[in-house]
Regions:
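Conserved P-loop NTPase architecture
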Residues: 1-147
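Glycine-rich phosphate-binding P-loop
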Residues: 146-167, 180
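Conserved, well-folded catalytic cores of nucleic-acid-processing
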Residues: 82, 86-93, 131-138, 164, ...
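Canonical P-loop GTPase G-domain recognition
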Residues: 274-331
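Conserved C-terminal guanine-recognition region of P-loop GTPase G domains, centered on the G4
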Residues: 217-290
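Switch I (effector-binding) loop of TRAFAC-class P-loop GTPase G-domains
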Residues: 141-143, 166-198, 206-219, 247
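Active-site glycine-centered loops adjacent to acidic/histidine catalytic or metal-binding residues
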Residues: 201, 271, 295
Length: 340
């Protein structure tokens, strides 16, 4: 009788120990596995503009000394596999124990080792949480809404124009990878069935090759490439925007982007028209023909600009309707690839 009792106690201890360890490891590994699967899925189905923003955010974190997203996800997966392996090993030891006490000791040893792994891997989980927090901070842009993007070199007056032509007070979107906010306004047209459109300034673009561009410039190019946009290229010909925004640089930036995106609805705008141009700079003579002269300070040209913006947005809407994206999730304008 005593032997039978001892045998039953041993079997119960074996079974209970293996079950406890299995439950523990699954309670840890399954959520980690679900997170990894969710990242794989989301990264695969992200809109190209969202994917660019996510990539820029993670790249900026990496430059600050943080792990890249692939490194973070790899570390999480390694932690998950370690917990599973440890749990299975100790569960097998408990299941094959020759006594009740041995089964209990194997179970307790498994709990201690899993706990130790999780304590040592706390930074892995915290890194994942930090990445998620950074990605959640990315402002939301209406991906399928017709949009006018204001593009140009730094300090040429783009955000002032956004504020001047927006139907209401624009908001400032702050991205995790830049200290400069991006002003986002809306235009409301009562004679359109879906009358709201977006207008946003973008970070300044410098006169340099793509491989030398920073995250802010990449954001500007992504908005031109991946959103249903018309382009307002803003030039300041006063000569007061700084060396990086010299008139020569501005014109070269403009010509390069126009060649890259030849099918986009486009308007050239000379800002600060209330101030004299730098007539001593020979580059002024090469300013694009037909550019609208605008001054936010005294209202010069704003009515003409607003009319032109509406025309361009109508063109964008017609393209979206033709490809079935007028009310969908958005995408790039038909007929333009990465090279425009």
């Amino acid at each position: 009788v005593d032997e039978e009792k001892i045998k039953n106690q041993r079997q119960r201890a074996r079974k209970l120990g293996a079950l406890k360890l299995d439950t523990l490891t699954k309670s840890i590994s399954k959520p980690l596995r679900d997170v990894l699967k969710a990242y794989d899925y989301e990264l695969a189905v992200l809109h190209p503009f969202e994917a660019t923003l996510a990539d820029l955010t993670v790249r900026a974190r990496a430059k600050q000394g943080h792990q890249s997203l692939p490194e973070v996800l790899k570390a999480v997966n390694e932690l998950r596999k370690s917990v599973l392996e440890t749990g299975k090993r100790h569960a097998a030891a408990a299941k094959n124990a020759t006594s009740k006490q041995e089964a209990i000791e194997a179970t307790e040893a498994g709990f201690r080792e899993v706990e130790s792994l999780m304590l040592e891997g706390a930074d892995v989980v915290l890194n994942l949480i930090d990445v998620q927090k950074a990605l959640r901070k990315i402002p939301i842009v209406q991906l399928g809404m017709p949009t006018v993007v204001l593009v140009g070199a730094p300090n040429v007056g783009k955000s002032s124009i956004v504020r001047a032509i927006s139907s209401g007070t624009p908001e400032v979107n702050n991205y995790p990878f830049t200290t400069r906010g991006m002003t986002l306004g809306h235009l409301q047209y009562e004679d359109w069935a879906e009358g709201q459109c977006q207008v946003m300034d973008t970070p300044g673009v410098l006169n340099r090759p793509d491989e030398e561009r920073n995250e802010m410039e990449s954001l500007t190019l992504a908005s031109m490439l991946h959103l249903p946009t018309a382009v307002m290229f803003v030039l300041d010909l006063t000569g007061n925007s700084g060396a990086l925004s010299s008139i020569e640089n501005q014109i070269q930036i403009r010509n390069g982007l126009r060649a890259r995106f030849p099918k986009r609805p486009w308007v050239d705008v000379i800002s600060k028209a209330d101030l004299p141009m730098d007539q001593e700079d020979p580059a002024v003579a090469r300013a694009p023909a037909g550019a609208l002269k605008v001054s936010v300070a005294d209202g010069t040209g704003l009515a003409d600009l607003e009319a032109r913006v509406k025309e361009m947005l109508l063109d964008v809407r017609e393209v979206l309707s033709a490809i079935g994206l007028a009310e969908g999730p958005g995408g790039r304008v038909e007929g333009e690839g990465s090279g425009g």
